[in-house]
Amino acid sequence: MKKNQFANKLIVIDLLSVQRESFYSFLTEGLAKELNNFSPIIDYTGKLELHLVTNQLVIKKPKFSFEEAKRRDCSYTISINIVTQLFNKNSGDVKEQEILLGEIPLMTQKGTFVINGAERVIVNQIVRSPGIYFNSEMDKNNLKTFNFLIIPNRGAWLKCEIDKNDLIWIRIDKNKKINLSIFFKALGIDHDDLRIKNAFRQPEFIYKNLNKDENYTQQEALEELHKKLFPGEPATSEASTKILYFKFFNPKKYDLGIVGRKKINKKLDLNSPENIRILTIQDILSGINYLINLKFGFGNIDDIDHLANRRLKSVGELLQSQISIGLIRLERLIKERMTICEQSSLVPSALINPKPIFAAIKEFFNSSQLSQFMDQVNPLAELTHKRRVSSLGPGGLSKERAGFAVRDIHPSHYGRICPIETPEGPNAGLIGSLAIYARINPDGFIEAPFYKVNQGQVLKNKGIIYLDAEQEDEFKIAPGDIRINETNFIKEINVPVRYRQEFTQCPAEEIDFIAVSPIQVISAATSLIPFLEHNDANRALMGSNMQRQAVPLIFPERPLVGTGLEAQIAKDSGIMAISRSNGIVKFTSAEKIIVTDSSNNQITYNLQKYQKSNQETCINHRPIVWPGERIKKGQILADGSATDTGELALGRDVLVAYMPWEGYNYEDAFLISDRLVYEDLYTSIHIEKYEIEARQTKLGPEEITRNIPNVGENSLKQLDENGIVVVSSFVESGSILVGKVTPKGESDQPPESKLLQAIFGEKNKDVKDTSLRLPNGTRGRVVDVRIFSREKGDELAVGINYIVRIYVAQKRKIQIGDKMAGRHGNKGIISKILPRQDMPYLPNGTPVDIILNPLGVPSRMNVGQIFECILGISAFNLKKRFRILPFDEMYESDSSRILINQKLKEAQTLTNLDYLFNENHLGKVALFDGRSGEKFDNPVLVGKIYMMKLVHLVDDKIHSRSTGPYSLVTQQPLGGKAQQGGQRLGEMEVWAFEAFGAAYALQELLTIKSDDIQGRNEALTAIVRGKTIPKPGTPESLKVLMREIQSLGLDIAAYRLPNLHHGEIKSIEIDLTHNKIVQKR
């Protein structure tokens, strides 16, 4: 691929702008807008007014830096102060004060929030846009009925429907149906009103509906409406009069939003000003007119899944609605205080309490479905999490009720939401990812970039034009992978296009727009898969998701075969240290880099060393500049975890062979060489946090000390004089990390202490050892120790004197049971590690690193891995790296195959390795068995593939139990590693025992080895005394089942039937509701 062509297909954008721009607009506009809606507050008597001066909003800097907030386990927040004025209309006094309104978490440069020391992300929510929606449904008689629904931003929903008898009904908030005639009367519209005549295309259809209830007055109609909406409440004339005003015409209770107003104006062809955000009578009349026209075959029904009807709520808007909730609570509080307190002595600070706003913000960040603990396994996982789009959450869908239509890929998703990247399982289709070049417009609709096309010529010099889904429907749009000549004219005569959600063909002269790049359809993670177009979509989905689970390695390596987006994604993830100005590097070390800029100012870049991520992987910076080097603004100073010279590096390129090997790679298992273990190719660092608190007890304070009773000097050698482990110590299971003693009372004394005291009158030490020890199965090096105490000014909970945190880093080499995967969804578990001398080897003696099963390719249809494999070995031998954008068939037919064959031939010519290129079986090599030295019968595909080690490590999964906790109800062992649980002998295992006829083994497993309490105690006694094990009794779970049946009023017990030689067994059916007995024979 030519370099200039490649560059033309990539446009540079900021992948985190979605989060940053939304939060910035909230701080600069949204917050003030919300406060303006709230001000002024007038008390119930109308004598006091509280005004918020929003143009004097003061935002104060955070108390701690972002790093310090994480270290102290507190939130990284800004304080919002506002100038308030209290007007007393009786005395004419005006009191002015600056007041703290609340604290709001501040977004970091990486688009995250620090809440209680943990980084969190606010996910973008995709919801139905406010506006008017027309729909058709089939009723129970299979007749087509029409309806419309007006959805506001805030307030009641209004639904209008035409039934099979051509009668029009109104529903407010899914309540009972209301006759149109009563609704019009309540609105003050008479039957002979001119507005009816002017608003309707078919006025006779309306008059047929209105002549039903002519004798109602407006007051009676309002009272009738009140009865329907609030059944059981008295319909007083005062309450009835206000009902419609509060539902649809009060700006404080009802808000269409600017978007809702625009959508209604466009759909109904109205020109109401955008600042009228309540419903108008004109909106209702025009809506009913459109509905009647639909009945007569005019107009269009709306597609609810079209992205023109769904908008994105990003962090700024979600926060704004949360502030609104807090302000509503605050308003109620202020009005109460205005009534209770003495008016003459009132000041604004006595009225405003920041707690309601604090609480609303805290509730949102700590417990909302959209505020999530950041996925921090690697830089790609972070970036993808911030670009995620969710249909779930408040005001959205729930995964239980969401049907297939909502989850499906819609034509309007093209270039906006990735059709590939979505979770597997119950959330499939409900959670997506923004396409790589998509952006959000101010109204919250997703836009995609295009070039204008004029008479078959692509006008690249005119720049990029962004269109939303609604605008796009009106144009003929060509995909990004059609061929264009040097003068930017489209080569093809007939071009595939999208037009009004259909895929069709048209001449090049009729095309209006063309996509800017073939990859604009897919998300950031999917765009990292080379030869994507040769993979089945299901496997591409797995490949996208598994890249996010790749563990950062000690020695990261950028891929030989990539797509060219690795550098952009690594840079935008915020994981690397990037220069903020031009200058010269003055000093570099593992801890910091000092740069002198053009104004001779020194800028210090502090580097992160062995920091723990949210998923316990290691965040670490490695400097890649040297003293004296001249640097430019935006240049990378230090690589982060999983990056290599500024490019994303999630795995390693290894030599693989596709062949079966003694059944060890059956069913997706992998065989690996011990070279991967000994050379630390797949070694990663994982950091775990261990914490201990020293509390104030009734018997005195707990002490952190080196003087621990009954502990030898050997166990204390790694502790300092305060009893805390020294940084850089190597610790193993059972090692003391923090020495702690707790005072104990007389009753806690063991019998031997009481005996000594009785004989010698000595008092044994009255403390017990409660030290923090390293748990079983863990070892590593202490990388950090943090001590929190009140003396240092740390905020600790009541009753806690000290907190000590120890961070232990473990090096985890690759081992049997670990999960590995490529970028094409080719995943597997390591089943065996072979010595490198036993691995199959190439004719030049090079042993392969991994043996994959060839049967994993045909049925999965992820052929991209074969292309990568062959191009990878060519790249390795040519000492080059290849960057191949997906959908490269635009250059010529079969271009991927031509390219890999061409590069393989070049590699053979350059290296003189004849086995590399064999025309009879391209890409395949005659391999030799490492054990016997004999050649294998058939040639084998050998190449270089980029393989990753995933976060599903066997060390975290493997678990055993001897004795442990039991469930209180069933008396069976608990399940799961966290509960120290056992392995369940389930239904299928029972079948296996039954199939073998192992009746006694099965009986034991289901009774005395499980939940027959009495039986297991008797069995233990019998074993101890050498007697015969008695027969098992009744399992506890059967007793539980019997109790449950008995609780339903059914007496269940075992009865012995009498020996009936000639009689019959009678079956009696009892109808419990009628007390009748029906006898059956």
Curated annotation (Swiss-Prot):
Belongs to the RNA polymerase beta chain family. Keywords: Chloroplast, DNA-directed RNA polymerase, Nucleotidyltransferase, Plastid, Transcription, Transferase. One of its GO terms (cellular component) is mitochondrion. The keyword Oxidoreductase does not apply. The keyword Signal does not apply. InterPro entries: DNA-dir_RNA_pol_bsu_ext_1_sf, DNA-dir_RNA_pol_bsu_external_1, DNA-dir_RNA_pol_su2, DNA-dir_RNAP_su2_dom, DNA-dir_RNAP_su2_hyb_sf, RNA_pol_bsu_bac, RNA_pol_bsu_CS, RNA_pol_bsu_protrusion. GO terms for biological process: DNA-templated transcription. CDD domains: RNA_pol_B_RPB2. One of its GO terms (molecular function) is DNA binding. In plastids the minimal PEP RNA polymerase catalytic core is composed of four subunits: alpha, beta, beta', and beta''. When a (nuclear-encoded) sigma factor is associated with the core the holoenzyme is formed, which can initiate transcription. This is DNA-directed RNA polymerase subunit beta. It is an enzyme of class 2 (transferase). It catalyses: RNA(n) + a ribonucleoside 5'-triphosphate = RNA(n+1) + diphosphate. DNA-dependent RNA polymerase catalyzes the transcription of DNA into RNA using the four ribonucleoside triphosphates as substrates. Gene3D superfamilies: 2.40.50.100, 2.40.50.150, 3.90.1100.10, DNA-directed RNA polymerase, beta subunit, external 1 domain (2.30.150.10), DNA-directed RNA polymerase, subunit 2, domain 6 (2.40.270.10), RNA polymerase alpha subunit dimerisation domain (3.90.1800.10), RNA polymerase Rpb2, domain 2 (3.90.1110.10). Its EC number is 2.7.7.6.
